[in-house]
Amino acid sequence: MLTSTLLAAATTPLQWSPTVGIIMILCNIVAIAFGKSTIQYPNAGPALPSSQFFGGFGLPALLATTAFGHILGTGVILGLHNLGRF
């Protein structure tokens, strides 16, 4: 009884498309821009091989901003899917 109720409430799975990839890339760019303006010491910690290529970020700042970008992108993608935009 409970299993059939849960299955009836489940949504259709989201299929990957280039639009999903573009949204994730845009969310990561927004997160990196946000991190660039708000991280107090962006070059702290171990340096990256070509720090100017990564905007002067150290490894911790780069990992933090891209992790935040993926969390933000996942929320945007799932939110748009929930609204029926995908």
UniProtKB/Swiss-Prot annotation:
Localization recorded for this chain is: Cellular thylakoid membrane
User: Membrane-crossing residues?
Assistant: 14-34, 53-73
**Residues excised as propeptide:** 1-4
The record, for SUPFAM superfamilies, names:
Photosystem I reaction center subunit X, PsaK
Kindly report the protein's main subcellular placement as a broad class: membrane
* This protein's UniProt keywords: Membrane, Photosynthesis, Photosystem I, Thylakoid, Transmembrane, Transmembrane helix
Q: Could you give one GO CC term from the UniProt record?
A: plasma membrane-derived thylakoid membrane
Q: Name one GO biological process term.
A: photosynthesis
**One Pfam family linked to the record:** PSI_PSAK
Q: Which Gene3D superfamilies match?
A: Photosystem I PsaK, reaction centre
Membrane-related topology note:
Multi-pass membrane protein
Give the matching InterPro entries.
PSI_centre_PsaK_sf (IPR035982), PSI_PsaG/PsaK (IPR000549), PSI_PsaK (IPR017492), PSI_PsaK_bact (IPR037101)
Listed as disulfide-bonded, the cysteine pairs are: none
Which family is this protein grouped under?
Belongs to the PsaG/PsaK family.
Q: What is this protein called?
A: Photosystem I reaction center subunit PsaK
Organism, by scientific name, is Mastigocladus laminosus (Fischerella sp.)
